[in-house]
Amino acid sequence: MKTLNRVSVIGAGAWGTALAGVAARAGREVTLYARDAATAAAISATRDNPRLPGIPLDRSIVVTHDLAAAGRADIIVIAVPAQNSRTAVAALAPHLAAGTPVIASAKGIEHGTRRFMTEVIEEAAPQTVPAILSGPSFADDVARGLPTAVTLAAKDEAMAVALVHALGSAAFRPYHTTDLRGVEIGGAAKNVLAIAAGIVVGKQLGASAQAALTTRGFSELVRLGLACGARSETLSGLSGLGDLILTCSSPQSRNFSLGIALGRGESAPRGKLSEGAFTAPALLELAAANGVEMPVANAVAAILAGRLTIDAAIDNLLTRPFRAEG
């Protein structure tokens, strides 16, 4: 396998900028691609990204608006929202050499197709090798170099190991797996479930209810994952349970914050993307296709679509028939 030294991150938002810093700290030659030329020029000149205030960009990172230049890399990291990933990968595809690993870092399922992000990469750039990076990680923590552990998956174990060694450091510790589906289901489902956890907090239903909701939500995540062929150890690992715990308990999570606002009867926080809101309908379609019941995720989707009030959703969940745990 060739040396994986040049890393390009596509997307100069908070997460993309944080991941560019990860690659730089790992000793790689890093390019950060911004779609907007003015944004690229400003970040390059000031070494500051307004999306990550107070965290200077490493001087070694090259910021560009040139997609062809960004494509000349040994590793590509796609750091755009899930629903924009296909467009980003398709635009980049003509500039990518055969066999280039392309790592998805968005947590979601594509609308309309029910495709996971590695499937989107496989379709939009079939000459490349899809991979996925996911786990309990906030952009601000990662950008500051605070200790973080994540999961990195690729179909080929040797490739997964090579990517881990290319991006890992003392502060950013990826664990490798070949279980793409498990990693992707964990990341997608936890965003939807975090909205429910936020609603519990916003409605002031108590810490006991929050713990119960998170645990029952995890049961839904596991049922769906196993039905889709995921491994149980992946679902109970960093990209599943680990990410769920973080996202269901921290106001840094946009999905959790959205739920808190909804629970308080407020409008959604402005200017903050909640992947869970976009993923909820696709997640339920996937669950239905696999014969999996997900009452908590279903309640979230119904609330977001305006089909059910929060109070009615809570009543529905609390009056479900008693059953054995599992």
Swiss-Prot record:
Q: Which GO terms describe its cellular component?
A: cytosol
Q: Which residues form the active site?
A: 190
Residues where sn-glycerol 3-phosphate binds: 107, 135, 137, 190, 243, 253-255
Q: Which reactions fall under this protein's catalytic activity?
A: sn-glycerol 3-phosphate + NAD(+) = dihydroxyacetone phosphate + NADH + H(+); sn-glycerol 3-phosphate + NADP(+) = dihydroxyacetone phosphate + NADPH + H(+)
Localization recorded for this chain is: Cytoplasm
Keyword terms of this UniProt record: Cytoplasm, Lipid biosynthesis, Lipid metabolism, NAD, NADP, Nucleotide-binding, Oxidoreductase, Phospholipid biosynthesis, Phospholipid metabolism
Q: Which residues bind NADPH?
A: 15, 35, 107, 139, 254, 273, 275
Q: Which domain of life is it from?
A: Bacteria
MF term (GO), any: glycerol-3-phosphate dehydrogenase [NAD(P)+] activity
What's one Pfam family here? NAD_Gly3P_dh_N
What's a single GO BP term from this record?
Answer: glycerol-3-phosphate catabolic process
Q: EC?
A: 1.1.1.94
Q: In which pathway does it act?
A: Membrane lipid metabolism; glycerophospholipid metabolism
Q: What does this protein do?
A: Catalyzes the reduction of the glycolytic intermediate dihydroxyacetone phosphate (DHAP) to sn-glycerol 3-phosphate (G3P), the key precursor for phospholipid synthesis.
> What is stated as this protein's family in its record?
Belongs to the NAD-dependent glycerol-3-phosphate dehydrogenase family.
Please identify the protein, giving its name as recorded.
Glycerol-3-phosphate dehydrogenase [NAD(P)+]
Species the sequence originates in: Nitrobacter hamburgensis (strain DSM 10229 / NCIMB 13809 / X14)
Gene of origin? gpsA
